[in-house]
Curated annotation (Swiss-Prot):
Source lineage: Eukaryota, Fungi, Dikarya, Ascomycota, Taphrinomycotina
Pathway noted in the entry: Amino-acid biosynthesis; ergothioneine biosynthesis
Single GO biological process annotation from the record: selenoneine biosynthetic process
Source species of the chain: Schizosaccharomyces pombe (strain 972 / ATCC 24843) (Fission yeast)
Binding site for S-adenosyl-L-methionine: 85, 91, 112, 142-143
Pfam families on file: FGE-sulfatase, Methyltransf_33
GO CC terms: cytosol; nucleus
Protein name: Ergothioneine biosynthesis protein 1
Keyword terms: Cytoplasm, Iron, Meiosis, Metal-binding, Methyltransferase, Monooxygenase, Nucleus, Oxidoreductase, S-adenosyl-L-methionine, Transferase
Region (Hercynylcysteine S-oxide synthase): 347-772
Transmembrane regions listed in the UniProt entry: none
Amino acid sequence: MTEIENIGALEVLFSPESIEQSLKRCQLPSTLLYDEKGLRLFDEITNLKEYYLYESELDILKKFSDSIANQLLSPDLPNTVIELGCGNMRKTKLLLDAFEKKGCDVHFYALDLNEAELQKGLQELRQTTNYQHVKVSGICGCFERLLQCLDRFRSEPNSRISMLYLGASIGNFDRKSAASFLRSFASRLNIHDNLLISFDHRNKAELVQLAYDDPYRITEKFEKNILASVNAVFGENLFDENDWEYKSVYDEDLGVHRAYLQAKNEVTVIKGPMFFQFKPSHLILIEESWKNSDQECRQIIEKGDFKLVSKYESTIADYSTYVITKQFPAMLQLPLQPCPSLAEWDALRKVWLFITNKLLNKDNMYTAWIPLRHPPIFYIGHVPVFNDIYLTKIVKNKATANKKHFWEWFQRGIDPDIEDPSKCHWHSEVPESWPSPDQLREYEKESWEYHIVKLCKAMDELSTSEKRILWLCYEHVAMHVETTLYIYVQSFQNANQTVSICGSLPEPAEKLTKAPLWVNVPETEIAVGMPLTTQYTSVGSNLQSSDLSAHENTDELFYFAWDNEKPMRKKLVSSFSIANRPISNGEYLDFINKKSKTERVYPKQWAEIDGTLYIRTMYGLLPLDDYLGWPVMTSYDDLNNYASSQGCRLPTEDELNCFYDRVLERTDEPYVSTEGKATGFQQLHPLALSDNSSNQIFTGAWEWTSTVLEKHEDFEPEELYPDYTRDFFDGKHNVVLGGSFATATRISNRRSFRNFYQAGYKYAWIGARLVKN
């Protein structure tokens, strides 16, 4: 007998109480359709040529199962595949065959409500297959209970789960409910777990009507059989099929088919205190089937917190199957308040936990992958320690009070002078041995629950000063999310080292064939820095004068900013010409290849192995030749040398700001949306640059400027964190603007934000564009 685990909850789904509540809404739960007889009748329906949905999906799976398997399965992680509502599994077998052919070990679970029919389907599948790589099991239960115990079916913490939701069953939900249904699964899945889902589009009304009201009246038998299921739940014949007739209605404008049972005459139903009296022609809704255009499908997917990977179309009818993946939580494009909300914190923390719990492991967290930097284990401790130190200024944390020794080891990292490493700002002492990752994860959890969650929930009670501390901690976490990631990619050392935990490989970016186009910018006056006027306090601000009196810097009347962003200044920028896009990998490679082999020094984002060049990405080492159209990322010194070879230079901070203002059509507003660009974890790799005339910014890398970080007029060190900028007024750090694909939107979208790195630093995700006078 095939293994089946019963996860329960059927007694709730099929209870007299749930049916009574449904009848009060003039409907019956559609799950009642699928008793043993109902499943057999539905099987007959799928064999009808009129029921185009089945044939359309079969058409897709026959043609594309191999491609779908490649996208769903991880080649290097354990794979779990769960089908939601498996039915007879004839179509599913096409996918299982493709999984077997791929040669990856897969544990497949078929989920269904009816244990007897599930057992029968699994036995038939086992009798017709002899899989070596695919293990087949069953789960008897409902979707809600599966969500509660989903991790039980994940073979290892890092294993990939792919869900199958076929048959256009998502159409049982209206569009808002469909997105909510997807979100319920997204909330339980890991980043880059997958879902294969089918949608029936808006086919012609005649085709739809025939599919749900066939001339053989099998659909009618199927729908009316729900009354037998109701009677079985109540244990007596409360409903007589002969009192009802099937009514099929398709609303073409709304795009929904509704199946009703209509009372032929007056019907009375009595069971104890339950009493219903249905008048002639009264309608009871049995099920809905919503039809969605491709655009509507994409909206449902996006609102469901998934990202579209690929789409497969049927040639039989307007019907598609989509591979979608759990994406990073969407970050707010335009902050509504100075201090990040709990929802913003939660989105950022999910990224951090993905890094510390999924990407970092015993093989990569103890090695210092970047010279003159700590190993990743330091950052696992640094983030919660920094939060603990600063948030304790607001409220003591009893949960972490006995771990003050962590403060000595993790308060501040190292950033020594590249040219003379003996010169370094003050930093925490390095322990003889680092605490275990589990100890640090528990510490982070305590800091999260007892500090961040409590403070965010009490936001209205916090003073402006206290909100500022909470904001500072949020942006500090965001910065170290990016730092830890660019250190992580340096751990890839072998040519065959690719990982699928971050999803499918990015599409190749072809080498550009044209020089960049030049954008002529006339003499312009710009405002730099955080606005100091009250013109922005209308954006939901409720700050009172009493709040401001407690504020460390009263120039910040709404949004917070770091010390090097303040005060706001006016600058006159002379006319200049700037490239419409950053320098590409291909252009920089051509520049390097003009040198002798002994003089060639490649960017640290590249790796030369056995004479072949690779690029370090979130997906491992990929052939550089496939991504020559991405922006090159290396040090200021490297890119400044390239600019000189082209008879150009790199832009000043004011010039680059002026160009960004022009492209984003911004003036002095604090935040501008970067939706659709390569920042804020909207994707995990740079954008492919283009030869066209578009002005390309936020392409996945920060951008260097020739402006050296210096103490500007009226600069005042950050009172909470005075060493943030002033430790780096050494003439060796250059200002960096924009953001990478891994930069939180509170930072990348803030016009005044200024990053800075040593000009010789090669490891950060920073590119550049050319300028000429």
